[in-house]
């Protein structure tokens, strides 16, 4: 089982430690559904790729991401490469295990790419990674941070593993441990209920839930790979982006 959560954590830590506090990454602290990051129902979101990515990859990403549109009153439009006006701007020139996205309308407040997809077309996890990152682009947060998830994280084991992986790259042990502690707090532990609107029940089958290894938790707690949109994922989209005449549940 590929540990996507750990790979992304290592990537963020390297970005922070190498860039320094002034430029320590573009992702903001997020909630499962932060109202200020939602798009408008019925809006057309333009998708542009940076650089000169493979045409087959672009089509596959667009086709897979469009599965969300079956449950959300939104449209996607694939526009020319390197279009800075696009709401979703994707770079693919990253390491294969690097995949991330800004949350919803946060993409409007940064320059350059708002999403990175290092996954290759041949990767068996291609669909689930694309769906997961586009879930973020539509305003969804990681399900493992749901206020009611109650995941028994073994934070000591996680911290030790991350420190060992980065020990040769960071000369200041205390700075490294502080960065790891901050990352575990903001990216692993549950969010406050007040930060989550709308709050639906915790869903271990959500495409937004990373697989979790038993080695990173106490007891026998683990989660396998989720490969498709769950019923809650679909309902969440209908609440955020209701079609005309349908009832939604979102802050404005």
Positions of predicted regions on the chain:
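Zinc-dependent metalloendopeptidases
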Residues: 1-252
